A protein has these predicted regions:
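A surface-exposed partner-binding patch
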Residues: 1-100, 158-184
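Compact, glycine/acidic-enriched structural inserts
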Residues: 105-141
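Soluble C-terminal extramembrane regulatory/interaction domains of multi-pass membrane proteins
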Residues: 142-147
Length: 184
């Protein structure tokens, strides 16, 4: 199976300690769709200051979304109960619907029923994170203004997956606005 981001490319961008792989196994409890499971075992998830994977070594919190939020956070919608936590990105808990492979964001401090779809799948999430990491490493090298650089990055992410920019308040729109404002 081929993916938009190769294992070698992800390792080159994030380094040996910046990629988390998941073992691929067959069992009745393995609820991941095949493409997602293959991607996570072959390519992996980044783990750095931008995206903090919950599956990295030493993580003691559960990856089950139902165990993630406290009662004070509100009631988790029923459709979200089987979802898994992938990590943190832009003040949001990032979760995975294991049946569809879709990736969702729960904004920090937001009502739980206001979650939004962030990416069509894990591959798209990792593709965008990979592009963002490369952008951050080279943004000061470019002769073009920051606005143009951000728009180029937005177009490259959008060409692969339109979902990250459908909502004006999506984590990706907020992050790229912060880059333009000089916060990142």
């Amino acid at each position: 199976m081929s993916f938009a981001v190769t294992p070698a490319e992800l390792l080159s961008t994030f380094g040996l300690t910046g990629v988390v792989h998941f073992p691929r196994y067959e069992s009745p409890d393995n609820r991941l769709d095949t493409r997602t499971a293959d991607f996570l075992s072959q390519v992996g998830l980044p783990h750095d200051e931008t995206f903090n994977s919950k599956a990295s070594a030493g993580q003691e919190e559960s990856i089950l979304l139902t165990e993630w939020f406290a009662p004070d956070d509100g009631i988790l919608p029923e459709e979200c109960h089987p979802w898994l936590v992938l990590g943190y990105f832009a003040a949001s808990v990032i979760s995975l619907d294991p049946h569809t492979g879709k990736v969702y964001a729960f904004g920090e401090g937001e009502p739980l029923n206001t979650y939004t779809q962030l990416h069509r799948d894990v591959e798209s999430l990792v593709h965008a994170l990979n592009l963002f990491k490369k952008f951050r490493e080279h943004q000061s090298d470019a002769q073009v203004g920051i606005d143009e650089q951000v728009e180029d990055l937005r177009a490259r992410i959008h060409a692969f997956d339109v979902i990250p920019f459908e909502d004006d308040q999506s984590p990706w729109n907020l992050v790229l606005d912060e880059v333009i404002e000089g916060i990142w």
